[in-house]
Amino acid sequence: MRPSNREHDQLRPVTITRNFTNYAEGSVLVEFGQTKVICNASIVEGVPRFLKGKNQGWITAEYGMLPRATHSRTEREASKGKQGGRTLEIQRLIGRSLRACIDLKVLGENTITLDCDVIQADGGTRTAAITGSCVAMRDAIHWMVQREKIKKMPAFNYVAAVSVGIYRGQPVLDLDYAEDVLAETDMNVVMNEQGHFIEVQGTAEDNSFNREQLNSMLSLAEIGIPQLIEIQKNA
């Protein structure tokens, strides 16, 4: 039995609230159960130096957690003077995932920056950030079209992410914190609406996992992610 009494293939309740803040070109509050993340998409003119003159855009991300997003206060990384390895890894994952949504050439020499701020963490913050940021980014691109910064709305490929793992010997979908801390295996899966994989990150925590368990976890992701994409489209 899972701590939340969910079935092994059941997501937590997921909600996506668009236009959550007033100033960002795209803004979303995404909630996976008790995990809550604000995802703001900002349009910035210009691209990184390595893309100058190539007539294409860029998508990047920043990620952070509020000090009391967790059970006890965590010191802000800004006060330490540097970002931790986990933060950098998550930022890169979010950026890679969202660059799979569109052809970067349609953005011109503009950058979309996704700021993902975790206001409450109960497991799966990075997967929630990817899922919410996809919607915020689509709204930001629509803003660009309205202001004639680009000619038309480009083809957009929705991307979502979910965690899967082995909890007490059983593959489960969308781990919360109570499961995550005891999981024998923890994996994050990113997929698009065609059912293609964008990224798979998996780590054995206490015990190794076999091919059958890996297949079971990927099958759970294939159950959960289409549901998340449907929620994105209906937000």
From Swiss-Prot:
Organism domain of life: Bacteria
Describe the reaction catalysed, as an equation: tRNA(n+1) + phosphate = tRNA(n) + a ribonucleoside 5'-diphosphate
Query: Is RNA-binding a UniProt keyword of this protein?
Result: yes
A single GO molecular function term of this UniProt record: 3'-5'-RNA exonuclease activity
Gene Ontology terms describing biological process: rRNA catabolic process; rRNA processing; tRNA processing
For this UniProt record, the keywords arranged alphabetically read as follows: Nucleotidyltransferase, RNA-binding, rRNA processing, Transferase, tRNA processing, tRNA-binding
UniProt cross-references to InterPro entries, sorted A to Z: ExoRNase_PH_dom1 (IPR001247), ExoRNase_PH_dom2 (IPR015847), ExoRNase_PH_dom2_sf (IPR036345), PNPase/RNase_PH_dom_sf (IPR027408), Ribosomal_Su5_D2-typ_SF (IPR020568), RNase_PH (IPR050080), RNase_PH_bac-type (IPR002381), RNase_PH_CS (IPR018336)
Q: Spell out the Pfam families in the cross-references.
A: RNase_PH (PF01138), RNase_PH_C (PF03725)
Q: Does the keyword Ion transport apply?
A: no
For this entry, the protein name equals Ribonuclease PH
The organism encoding this protein is Legionella pneumophila subsp. pneumophila (strain Philadelphia 1 / ATCC 33152 / DSM 7513)
